Amino acid sequence: MSFITVAGAKPLLDGIKGRLTEAIKGERDKGHSPAMAILRIGNDPASEFYFRAKLKKASELGVETRAITMDEDASPQDVMAHLDQMIRDPLIQGIMIESPVPGQLDYKTLVNRIPWYKDIDGASYENLGRLMSGMPALVAATPLAVMEYVSSFKIPTGSTFAVINRTITVGRPLSQLLLNSNFTPTVCHSKTRNLAALCRSSDVIVVAAGKPGFLGSEMVTADSIVIDVGINSVKGKIVGDARFDEIKDIVKYITPVPGGVGSLTSNLIFSNLLQAMGYQEERTKQIS
């Protein structure tokens, strides 16, 4: 697959959609019905947007969804009761909890209640631990989206990566995926010394600092590949963490924001659902 310097997501997105459509049809032909549950608590506008976007995407792909919406003042006990019901339901293969949740609830507690094999957000500590241990796991969609780009760029094994993020949802799982693929990642953060020099010496820079304009021309070279994971709102406009206009004519490749990594994530959740179905099928065989 060839890309111009600005590597938009459309070629990758078309490929992912094609794979998903074929795989979901295959499951249906075998008599299986991919189904997921999405739990939303409260009235957060951003949560509402993503909630509806997932329902729309599921409908397009032919995935059954059970959408549960609870009031802003829902008690932890009531939320847990609904969550446990989803967990016990054998017809639901994947569960997601929209964030943020209201103040009386703890998102991490809720997510870690979900068995790893139904946690299609890849947000539980167990899934992260399984990934780090080389065991079957469901991985968060953002690191998976980065790996889709890595694969398409045909980056040689052994290449060096500067991963500017150390969170358990992006930097840490991504670094493990890179290691598993025989790349050489360095996880960077706000206290990393000589970060600009480290970025310049790396083959690939994955920037997810959460700061608009963080990555500038002083941190890249003509051979740099920049994968921008940042999503920031600046004066009503969505921008990444890289100073896009400043470096797009310098670097080898750069992913845009919007239209880059973020465009892939909603589809990769459904890839996780299919993977979850496989894990649950294996568990059923082992139990029986």
Regions found by a protein language model. Give the residues of each.
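Rossmann-fold NAD(P)-binding glycine/threonine-rich loop
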Residues: 108-128, 230-280
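Glycine-rich phosphate/diphosphate-binding loop of Rossmann-like nucleotide-binding domains
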Residues: 41-53, 137-225, 234-248
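Anion-binding alpha/beta catalytic cores of soluble intermediary-metabolism enzymes, centered on
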Residues: 6, 96-157, 198
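C-terminal helix-to-coil terminal segments
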Residues: 2-7, 11, 264-288
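Short, well-structured alpha-helical segments in soluble
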Residues: 78-90
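Positively charged, low-complexity intrinsically disordered leader regions
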Residues: 1-32
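Short beta-strand elements in bilobed, periplasmic/extracellular small-molecule ligand-binding domains
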Residues: 58-73, 185-188
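Short beta-strand segments enriched in small/hydrophobic residues
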Residues: 33-42
